Amino acid sequence: MSIKKNLYIISFFIIFNFANAEENLKSVGKFKDWESFILSQDGNKTCFAQSIPVVRAPKKLKREPSRLFVSFRPAENIKNEVSVTNGYEFKLKAPVTAKSGKKSYDLFSKGKFAWVVDSKDDTKLIVTMKKASRLMIIGNTDKGDQTTDHYSMMGFTKAYNTAKKNCS
């Protein structure tokens, strides 16, 4: 099979799966700077609250969109999972940090995503997010550029509660 034909087949499956995922993705509420969703796939559902940053620095660095999530996946017994994508491949073994005021949480990265190091800290970070007006995510690209994304917490509690309720 030719390379061109292989690329065509791969592209078809990627597009089909993306379109299929969009059909199964439903917004269940917009709350100021946050939104809650339900994703249904293969009889399982994932509920999550998500937001995009209100400030991304440095401005001139080219990268894909950033997103901050709190997810619930009942089939996998996952609750309160905080994750983030900064729109780039994170630098291997470089720290990723979530900060609000004097509170700071360590995250580990794999590829384009990062998660809280200790799952017990997910709940602590969520409590911080409920009380905060802003959360900063500081990370490093695989090329060594440091980024800081600022997320508004306006609407977080309602979006979080909606996501949690829909997957309980």
Locations of the language-model features?
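Sec-dependent N-terminal signal peptides
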Residues: 6-16
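A generic "folded-domain core" signal
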Residues: 21-168
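Positively charged n-region of N-terminal signal peptides that target proteins for export
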Residues: 1-5
